[in-house]
Each structure stands twice: as structure tokens, then as C-alpha cells.
């Protein structure tokens, strides 16, 4: 009888623990949206909260390319379209509502430089050609930028193959970014972590 009672108590405790875990999981699921590619979606408010804990790195793909569109070019044919510039500006306004303090680094292409310029409404920027080359060395390059920025938040304008590489390497997911899509990372103790996909709003 005693053994049966002990087993019953243990089972009740197990069920209570299991029920508690399910409640926590349900709560987390209701608070965080997920992209179809398996990446958590991070909006401006969530990004701002993360930035209070660690320096954040937001990597954007450039705006609409002129040489792959029938839309009007902003200027140079290797740059972005007028529509792309306007989209970048609107995105920059939404972004700055939650993150005002950041350093800006585009790769050394006309399309990324124009995208960064319109995104930030003319904020000073530093071109970094290493943001064009994506592979295992990209993390060291990002950490170098963080050190230059004295661990401030940084925004990088780069290319689709860079974002695809990071998503696959860090989380094992396929990410095929559209124009101005972005990934969010944070730095902690010298390491970079991929938090998810930035979703304005």
C-alpha cells in the first residue's frame, strides 16, 4: 500500500511538472511569431528590448536593384531603383522609431551604399568591402565592426548570399531574402548569435 501511495504521489508530481511545462511552452508560442523559414520574427519593440541587453547587429539586404528591374533607376544603373530608395527610407523611419543609436556599414557596392544612405536619411556611414564576401570569415568581420563601434548597435547593408549563409550556418534553415529583408544578431562575450528575422512593425 505504501509503495502504491508513493508511486501515485510521484505520478502526480510528474503530471504537475509536465502540465507546467506545457503552460510555459504555450505562453512562449503565443508571444513569438515564427517565419515560414523557421526563424523567429523580431519586430522593432523586441529588437529594442534585445538592444538593452546586448549590442545588436542588423544585416539588411540592399533595396531593389536597378539592373534587375523595369522600374526607374535612382541614378547609376548598378544602383537601386527610385522605388527601392523610397522603400529604404520608409523602412529606416520605422526602424529608427525603436533603434536610434547605431553605426552604419554598407558593403562597397553602389546598391548597398545607396540603400544605406536612404535608409538613414543621410547619416554618416563607413563602407566596408568585407561585407561583400560571405563565408566563415563574416563573423570575424562583424566582430571587427563591433569593436570599431565600441560595442554600439550596428546596421549592415549587404547581399542576399550573406544572409542565406548566416541563416544556414547558425540555425540550419533556408533563408532566401527579398529586398530589404534582414537578420538580427547579437554579440555576447565575443560570440555572435542569430536571433531571427527582422519584421518591421
UniProtKB/Swiss-Prot annotation:
Which GO CC terms are listed, alphabetically? periplasmic space
Give the lineage: Bacteria, Pseudomonadati, Pseudomonadota, Gammaproteobacteria, Enterobacterales
- CDD domains, sorted: HP
Query: What InterPro entries does the record point to?
Result: His_PPase_superfam (IPR029033), LipoPS_heptP_Pase (IPR011310)
Q: Name where it's found.
A: Periplasm
Known role: Catalyzes the dephosphorylation of heptose(II) of the outer membrane lipopolysaccharide core.
Protein name as it appears in the record: Lipopolysaccharide core heptose(II)-phosphate phosphatase
Q: Where is the signal peptide?
A: 1-35
Q: What class of enzyme is it?
A: hydrolase
Coiled-coil ranges per UniProt: none
Q: Which GO terms describe its molecular function?
A: phosphatase activity
What Enzyme Commission number(s) apply to this enzyme? 3.1.3.-
Indicate where this protein is primarily found: periplasm
* Originating species: Salmonella paratyphi C (strain RKS4594)
Q: Which UniProt keywords apply?
A: Hydrolase, Periplasm, Signal
Q: Which family does it belong to?
A: Belongs to the phosphoglycerate mutase family. Ais subfamily.
Amino acid at each position: 500500500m505504501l509503495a502504491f501511495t508513493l508511486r501515485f504521489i510521484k505520478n502526480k508530481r510528474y503530471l504537475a511538472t509536465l502540465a507546467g511545462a506545457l503552460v510555459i511552452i504555450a505562453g512562449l508560442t503565443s508571444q513569438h511569431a515564427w517565419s515560414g523559414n523557421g526563424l523567429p520574427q523580431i519586430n522593432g519593440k523586441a529588437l529594442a528590448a534585445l538592444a538593452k541587453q546586448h549590442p545588436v547587429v542588423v544585416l539588411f539586404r540592399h533595396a531593389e536593384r536597378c539592373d534587375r528591374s523595369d522600374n526607374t533607376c535612382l541614378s547609376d544603373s548598378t544602383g537601386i531603383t527610385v522605388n527601392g530608395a523610397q522603400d529604404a527610407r520608409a523602412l529606416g523611419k520605422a526602424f529608427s522609431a525603436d533603434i536610434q543609436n547605431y553605426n552604419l556599414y554598407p558593403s562597397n557596392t553602389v546598391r548597398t551604399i545607396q540603400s544605406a544612405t536612404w535608409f538613414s536619411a543621410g547619416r554618416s556611414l563607413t563602407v566596408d568591402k568585407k561585407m561583400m564576401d560571405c563565408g566563415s570569415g563574416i563573423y570575424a568581420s562583424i566582430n571587427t565592426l563591433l569593436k570599431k563601434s565600441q560595442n554600439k548597435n550596428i546596421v549592415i547593408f549587404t547581399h542576399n548570399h550573406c544572409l542565406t549563409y548566416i541563416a544556414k550556418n547558425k540555425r540550419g534553415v533556408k533563408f532566401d531574402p527579398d529586398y530589404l529583408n534582414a537578420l538580427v544578431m547579437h554579440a555576447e562575450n565575443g560570440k555572435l548569435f542569430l536571433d531571427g528575422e527582422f519584421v518591421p512593425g
